[in-house]
């Protein structure tokens, strides 16, 4: 049977804006109040997804969240008509309105943690939506995320969906952005790497001092239990607190893995060699640990360019390719390193550059925009086929974006009642295009 690693990219929502909501994310904060272009953002994401599909990759799309989130605004005391709720919130609590209008669900690396059937005791693919409790604007996502994932991976014979973890900082969970999987072949049992920022229940354990550690060891271990993983299939690694304090808010900003390759910065982890030895003990295959030294790429350059927030994909030919943002080309140190990497004795043979600047300016590169799902051909056949990228879906979604999206949006525009109508009309049509059913609150 054939096996694949599919990428499910987040479709950028109609309210994509730069509100600077993500403390600890340097790009998000430094670009606050820029004028955004939701139409361009959505099209940049679609272009990247279509390019991967054209390379022979299994490529899907995940629908965005409903925004503005009037349900949350009403829960916190704003009332009256929809227009009045927006008007009140804009006047009395503009930052809360901004949080309820974020299009951050585009970064589906934070949507969930996924364990393939080759690793789990029950032989099913497991999904746990991330609770994202560290950030208000993301903490309102998990329920709808769960509905969208269930509508996309709907066959219970193959897919096991869990609820998100308890909504408490002890179980802070940021999903696949802090998780990667190493294996020989996608269909073989592998080792899942769970990267955490702190131990919530151990006050003496190392933790960052400036920025929050969004992922806890307790959350990572809970997900591993839910997914029915054996101890021999898991390695729990602490991210270096010092790099979190330099803007590395998720592990996918400082490391990325694919099959038998782990590509990471030398400052990425604590006790690096000890953990590499553990991976080698648990995974009996030839492994490539590509460590990027600070002398060649400083942490600041890695964060600005998102060198590690790249995708490493294996093409049908077996060749590994890095999918990088054009920002990596524009940074001399990073571009020089990537060119050098191609001359080294590793499976990575090519770097492809994509313009995802609308996402990058909000702090999300190519790897943020995708959720990896390793599947066999029967599982791929069981996926909602209307969510899989092909010529027809690409054309239809581009027309849909042209029809419904603005090409200019400021934070002041978020209080425009017309934006609610535009967004709901667009999402209602999208659920019909992608055959998702009533996943949104306004449809229920």
Curated annotation (Swiss-Prot):
Enzyme class, first EC level, given as a word: hydrolase
Catalytic site positions: 174, 250, 368 (nucleophile)
Pathway, per record: Amino-acid degradation; L-arginine degradation via AST pathway; L-glutamate and succinate from L-arginine: step 2/5
Keywords: Arginine metabolism, Hydrolase
Catalytic activity: N(2)-succinyl-L-arginine + 2 H2O + 2 H(+) = N(2)-succinyl-L-ornithine + 2 NH4(+) + CO2
Documented EC number(s): 3.5.3.23
Source superkingdom: Bacteria
Regions that span the bilayer: none
Molecular function per GO: N-succinylarginine dihydrolase activity
GO biological process terms held by the UniProt record: arginine catabolic process to glutamate; arginine catabolic process to succinate
UniProt: substrate binding residues: 19-28, 110, 137-138, 214, 252, 362
InterPro entries referenced in this protein's UniProt entry, alphabetically: AstB_sf, SuccinylArg_d-Hdrlase_AstB
Database matches in PANTHER family: N-SUCCINYLARGININE DIHYDROLASE
Assembly mode: Homodimer.
Family membership noted in the UniProt record: Belongs to the succinylarginine dihydrolase family.
Role according to the record: Catalyzes the hydrolysis of N(2)-succinylarginine into N(2)-succinylornithine, ammonia and CO(2).
HAMAP family: AstB (MF_01172)
Name this protein carries in UniProt: N-succinylarginine dihydrolase
Native source species: Shewanella baltica (strain OS223)
Gene behind the chain: astB
